[in-house]
A protein has these predicted regions:
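Amphipathic alpha-helical packing elements
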Residues: 37-81
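Polar/charged low-complexity regulatory segments
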Residues: 2-40, 49, 96-147
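An exposed acidic His-Trp-rich patch
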Residues: 74-106
Length: 147
């Protein structure tokens, strides 16, 4: 088994605060801090990670520093978010969640993920980023751990 891990918490998952993708962001930064994030994954990328930080009004480096220094459990991380988020209203959370759930990858990204997974790019194929990222994670997990 690998000494690094593919993050398997979906971007579609929310913790008690109700913010989708936040548990995945915590997992990826935590794994990177421990030197255990699979090399093909950024701890904080320009997609859902950046969207989530921006929606909450959190600074990337402050989040990284907190996780590095404190190695928090997920509820401890959410407590930090609750304390420091600049926009944590129900409306802001719902707007963010809708943006994440409604995001579609570009054609090239979709085709690449579907091809790697051996799936046809037809009318039944997922188009949304969350579903495609799940497929990509499961494929990467299979390659790294099960193959």
């Amino acid at each position: 088994m690998s000494d690094t891990y593919v993050p398997l918490i979906s971007s579609g998952v929310a913790g008690p605060l109700g913010v989708v993708h936040l548990p995945r962001l915590w997992q990826k930064v935590s794994l990177e801090t421990a030197g255990k994030l699979a090399s093909s994954y950024p701890a904080v990328g320009k997609g859902f990670d950046a969207m989530t930080l921006a929606a909450l009004g959190l600074e990337e480096q402050a989040v990284r520093n907190y996780i590095k220094q404190n190695k928090p459990t997920y509820p401890q991380f959410e407590a930090l978010v609750k304390k420091n988020a600049k926009s944590l209203t129900r409306e802001a959370i719902e707007k963010h969640n809708a943006a994440v759930r409604g995001y579609n990858h570009d054609d090239e990204t979709r085709q690449s993920i579907l091809s790697a997974c051996g799936m046809a790019d037809d009318a039944s194929a997922p188009r949304d980023g969350v579903s495609l990222n799940n497929l990509d994670d499961w494929y990467e997990f299979h390659q790294a751990v099960l193959k």
